[in-house]
């Protein structure tokens, strides 16, 4: 099965003061199916709601699976919690975040550990998680290279993900396996991926800006800030 392991839906927006993602779980599922995927892990920021709704929605699409999860904001960087169904508090130390993910039956993956656009980034603390995202479609080549180097040197399980915040880029990266949680942990997942182009990232920003402007206009405020853009 071909899986997307890192994507966001509108339920990321409930935890962040901006339009972090643009599409519903159903829209992400339909986009993934069109691109030939058989499953996605929905990893909204600090919320499992999108994943739970996505899993229920996926039942109407024969042969397609959704695994709930979240991208947890730990004290020192982002950690994917794959296979959890309960929210985990943000701001905890890496070790405590990983422990809570394990207690909930999930697997912890260091998200883009050497990214320069997401701060703080885990960097060497990625070795405290169950696995390392060595290819993130929105990260730089150098950031992915650093993640690959440390993971391979320390023999850590690895993953890839698109980090999609809208349907257009879902499936840019991921893994091929039967059971993501088990196969990642055992190092059996086959990685695939291509970089999200600068054009797609800028187009997303324009859509995001339009959504923010519409919301501000309805609320009586039209002042926009560039730091509200995700990428």
Language-model features: where?
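Divalent metal-dependent hydrolysis catalytic cores, especially in the metallo-beta-lactamase
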Residues: 27-46, 107-109
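Flexible loop residues that form catalytic
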Residues: 45, 113, 137
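A short helix->loop->beta-strand "cap" motif at the edges of active sites that frequently abuts
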Residues: 37, 64, 106, 154-156
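Short active-site-proximal "capping" loops at secondary-structure junctions
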Residues: 45-50, 72-73
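Aromatic-lined carbohydrate-recognition surfaces of secreted/lumenal glycan-active proteins
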Residues: 109-117
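Charged helix-capping and loop-helix junction motifs
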Residues: 20-25, 91-94
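Short beta-strand/loop segments at the ligand-binding rim of alpha/beta enzyme cores
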Residues: 63, 101-110
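Charged catalytic cores and adjacent phosphate/nucleic-acid-binding surfaces used
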Residues: 1-17, 30, 52-53, 61, ...
